[in-house]
Regions:
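Catalytic cores of nucleic-acid endonucleases
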Residues: 109-163
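Localized chelating/binding microdomains
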Residues: 38-46, 50, 60, 64-68, ...
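Domain-level recognition of nuclease-like catalytic cores that cleave nucleotide substrates
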Residues: 142-220
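Conserved catalytic cores of phosphodiester-cleaving nucleases, focusing on short active-site segments
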Residues: 94-96, 102-109
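Active-site metal-binding core of divalent-cation-utilizing nuclease and nuclease-like domains
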Residues: 69-99
Length: 220
């Protein structure tokens, strides 16, 4: 049977073997809220992995808006209705919509854990309602320091100590450095799930050419 005669469901099974499809069919077939969230996180991970390939490009311009706009642009190229700095209870960093479904992401460069907490609180108490059409959100954490695993573990411990109602966390099966947290949303009174996603942008090469470049920079 030729590819022209395959149904969307049949094509979806072939996505992993046909790079040109690039998850396109899964996005079309995502009818439920849970399907929308699952496919979105898969696509965000793909974008993150691509961004992590060249951390050296971000060392001189460490700006949250630039990093987040690039993610938004990639989501748009994938066909998502994505926007940056959208007015939803405030100026949300990243908003993705599909029909009545809304996913909101808050982005922070890791400076300290209180700074991440403020971003979490913006997502939790300012931007999201926690209603059934937006019961999930995300925290994008741009990490320029070393040892992302340690940063994420300490962030989870910090969050656990904040006495959120019915707080719980669990590790992400699809990405070991990410984790999910759940708690009772202040506004809706329902369970709100946040995916905490690190973006590894640490860059400190220690090969000979890198050391020479550092010496030359000091001399200059």
């Amino acid at each position: 049977m030729s590819i022209e005669n395959l149904t969307l469901l049949e094509l979806q099974k072939l996505e992993g073997n046909i790079p040109e499809l690039d998850g396109f069919i899964s996005r079309i077939l995502a009818k439920t809220y849970d399907d929308f969230i699952d496919v979105l996180y898969k696509d965000i991970d793909t974008i993150i992995f691509t961004k992590e390939e060249n951390p050296e490009l971000y060392q001189l311009d460490k700006k949250e808006d630039r990093l987040t706009v690039e993610i938004m642009q990639q989501l748009r190229r994938m066909g998502y209705q994505a926007s940056h700095d959208t007015k939803i209870g405030g100026h949300a960093d990243l908003v993705v919509k599909k029909k009545e479904y809304i996913w909101i992401g808050e982005a922070k460069i890791h400076k300290d854990y209180e700074y991440l907490w403020q971003g979490f609180q913006q997502l939790n108490t300012r931007y999201s309602t926690g209603d059934c059409n937006q019961k999930d959100g995300g925290l994008l954490i741009y990490i320029f320091v070393q040892n992302t695993k340690s940063v994420m573990e300490k962030w989870q411990e910090y969050l656990s100590a904040k006495n959120l109602i019915n707080y719980a966390y669990f590790f992400c099966r699809k990405r070991s450095l990410a984790f999910f947290s759940t708690h009772i949303h202040d506004s809706s009174g329902q369970v709100f799930t946040v995916r905490h996603m690190p973006i590894i942008l640490h860059f400190s090469p220690k090969d000979k050419s890198a050391m020479r470049a550092k010496l030359e920079k000091k001399k200059g």
